[in-house]
Design a protein with these regions (language model features):
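Gly/Ala-rich beta-loop-alpha elbow adjacent to hydrolase catalytic centers
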Residues: 84-95
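Extreme N-terminal starter segment of soluble prokaryotic enzymes
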Residues: 1-6
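Surface cap/lid and interfacial helix-loop subdomains adjacent to catalytic sites
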Residues: 8-54, 58, 62-79, 99-285
Length: 285
């Protein structure tokens, strides 16, 4: 069997607009380092920004679009079978490519498997213990021919926000956030409000009953945000231990389940099993 190329797409802040590195870095390095010599891993650089967060200042949406183009180029350059792995925003990049394959806009006959760590568009029910779904809502369709493995922690709101989480409203409002392109951000925000296209549109109304529901939603959102924040917080000399914190960045450092393996180790094992028992079958636009 020919060597499998693993293309890794990192999360927000793990790459930058002029990133031409080929060696895998960031959290996903713990996946690729655990693979055997049947695999050759390559980093796919892109802006990896969320507005003012990380270099470049592009909006999440614009950053993802650049990532999609670069990932497709990398898939076309791969000499044989390909597997894709993504973390956080990198999952969104991969999901967009999968959507193009599902729609018939892109052929990818060499794509054999996909692994997604903390997918912001994670569907409900794909990970045991996760009762919610990705904070960014439903992603693009996934072709039936491509096996996908999701890696998620139940307390990571990026991939497992509650169904009516207030954090979804923040995600909706900031998808196009960019101080470099304020006009685009404002225009997209106006369209969102004008058409009431929020994920929570059907769950928000003005009534005393809604107010009681909103109290629960506020408590839930607070817990979700604590899970996202670091495990240790400091402000003006005051240090606080946040026992719930760090869930989004712990996939390489903490056991994910009863096996004692980290999420990255679990994904590496799955990729190796796919390569052993399901040998990959070229990418054409």
């Amino acid at each position: 069997m020919s060597q499998v190329t693993v293309l890794a797409v990192g999360g927000t802040g793990e790459s930058h607009p002029d990133d031409h590195r080929r060696h895998v870095t960031g959290l996903l390095r713990d996946v690729t380092d655990a693979l055997d010599d049947r695999f050759a891993s390559r980093w796919v650089g892109y802006p990896a920004s969320y507005g003012p967060v990380a270099a470049g200042g592009l909006s999440y949406r614009q950053s993802t679009e650049v990532g999609v183009r670069r990932l497709i180029d990398a898939m076309e350059d791969a000499p044989g079978p390909v597997m894709l792995i993504g973390y956080s925003q990198g999952c969104t990049v991969i999901r967009e490519v999968l959507g193009q394959i599902a729609s018939g806009a892109l052929r990818a006959d060499n794509l054999s498997a996909v692994g997604l760590v903390s997918d912001p568009e994670q569907p409900a029910g794909v990970v045991p213990g996760c009762r919610g779904r990705g904070v960014a809502g439903d992603g693009a369709p996934i072709p039936d021919s491509v096996p996908v493995q999701w890696i998620a922690h139940p307390d990571d709101m990026i991939c497992n926000a509650s169904d009516d989480s207030y954090v979804r409203d923040i995600a909706d409002l900031t998808r196009w956030m960019s101080f470099r392109a304020m006009r685009t951000w404002l225009a997209q925000t106006w369209e969102l409000i004008r058409h009431n296209s929020f994920q929570n549109a059907a769950r928000t109304r003005v009534s005393p009953r809604q107010w009681r529901t909103d109290l629960r939603r506020l408590r839930t959102a607070a817990i979700e945000v604590l899970g996202y924040l670091p495990p240790r917080l400091a402000w003006r000399g005051v240090r606080v231990v946040n026992a719930r914190g760090g869930r989004h960045v712990a996939y390489a450092s903490e056991p994910l389940d009863a096996s004692g393996l980290t999420g990255c180790q679990i994904l590496a094992q799955w990729l190796q099993v796919r390569a052993t028992f399901e040998p990959p079958l070229r990418v054409a636009a």
